[in-house]
């Protein structure tokens, strides 16, 4: 089983996980994002086909990147997923897909946590 250290581990490569990665990177904080599926998978397969974002594209965008649709349009679920993937690539988010967190334990020897994943 491999062992690795990081300052911050972000669990989940969805909207919040990718946003957190951008903020951590902009502040120079070393981190890793782990996602059990692919980035934004819940937007693709766990939503109704008719679902759209709950705000217009100009409101729901991340800093520095527009949606492909009109600013006043409500992006469809697959467009949101594609946007999140493209944003993660744009910011070079350190995402590892196919990695599921299986256990989290406080580290008694020093500050922090010991995380077990499907990858070790």
Where are these predicted regions, by residue range?
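Short, glycine/charged-enriched secondary-structure capping and boundary segments
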Residues: 24, 46-50, 110
């Amino acid at each position: 089983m491999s062992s690795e250290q990081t300052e911050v581990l972000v669990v989940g490569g969805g909207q919040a996980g990718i946003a957190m990665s951008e903020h951590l990177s902009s502040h120079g904080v070393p981190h890793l994002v782990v996602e059990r599926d692919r980035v934004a998978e819940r937007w693709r397969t766990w939503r109704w086909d008719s679902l759209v974002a709950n705000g217009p594209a100009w409101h729901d965008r991340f800093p520095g990147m527009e949606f492909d649709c009109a600013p006043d349009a409500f992006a469809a679920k697959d467009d949101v997923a594609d946007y999140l993937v493209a944003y993660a690539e744009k910011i070079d988010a350190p995402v590892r897909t196919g990695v599921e967190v299986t256990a989290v334990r406080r580290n008694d020897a020093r500050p922090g946590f010991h995380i077990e994943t499907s990858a070790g």
